[in-house]
Amino acid sequence: MAEKVIRTIGVLTSGGDAPGMNAAIRAVVRTALGKGLKVRGIRRGYSGLLNEEIIDLSARDVSDTIQRGGTILLTARCEEMRTPEGQQKAAAICKKYGIDGLVVIGGDGSFKGAQKLSDFGVNTIGLPGPIDLDIACTEYTIGFDTAVNTAMEAIDKVRDTSTSHERCSVIEVMGRDAGYLALWCGIANGAEKILLPEEHDYDEAKIIADIKESRKRGKKHYIIINAEGIGDSMNMAKRIEKETGMETRATILGHMQRGGSPTAKDRVYASIMGSLAVDLLLEGKTNRVVGYKHGEYIDFDINEALAMQKGIPEYQYDIAKQLAI
């Protein structure tokens, strides 16, 4: 069978937005144009694809975007893309607009859509875009570095006022199934306790006992970093205050972690990944996801990537506990 010729590349962002997505879009557009290809941007992810919200992109269309947070193509979640009918319709629309290859920037759900499009003959490459680093095949996802720094700066401010008032603070960060944001923020902010969905070691009685003991050791504050997957931060704070007598406040950082200008790392890594995605399509590859491991950019079969399991580095978690004295 003759190798598919790539003449036009599409690019979309799907699911939650992440700082650095614009850098990736920019790299896809300019790399493809530099290699003589046409580029079509798809607005609002798979929802926009199904509604034919498709525009031509030039080098100027992505000017002044590398430093901007969010995604210039907009993003959305799309239930219709989960159905066989929606997937077949999406593939037909790609063919209608001459899109031979598609770069999908997003997470697991976005990659499942890319996998189905590949089955229907649209060459697809995925770029990892969840800010909580929950893609198992890679040590880096677009936006994670910015999200960590955004959360760290916010937690520093909460810590300042917690010390002044000799207060306990329960600070909730994103991470439904993955605790990387909580772990990194916990280490970076010197938290006394980090609660991770992967560890299954949440024991409120032990936390309360530790808070009481820390007061005896002269600690003026007690910082708990709580991953979204554990949740219940508001009620947790109320129970802690009731049992310890220590004024306790809950802070949920929420969607602020998705915003803001991307860090240098996110701009550089996203740019490299976007450029590599175009190269992979020109090599005739499909149903692949770009990752970063052991200092190298690599690509995996999407099916294999989705099947991988990711755990928290225990040595990092142990270090966090050792330092919280």
Task: Report the location of each language-model feature.
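N-terminal phosphate-binding or glycine-rich loops at protein starts, especially the Walker A/P-loop
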Residues: 2-50
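Short beta-strand elements at the ligand-binding edges of bilobed clamshell
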Residues: 137-148, 261-267
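Glycine-rich oxoanion-binding loops at beta->alpha junctions
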Residues: 2-3, 49-102, 109-110, 142-149, ...
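C-terminal non-catalytic interaction/assembly regions of soluble proteins
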Residues: 232, 240-325
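Accessory alpha-helical/coil subdomains and C-terminal extensions
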Residues: 104-106, 116, 123, 144-247, ...
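Short, ordered loop/turn segments at secondary-structure junctions
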Residues: 14-17, 37, 42-47, 77-78, ...
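Short glycine/serine/threonine-rich phosphate/pyrophosphate-binding segments
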Residues: 18-28, 50, 84-85, 101-115, ...
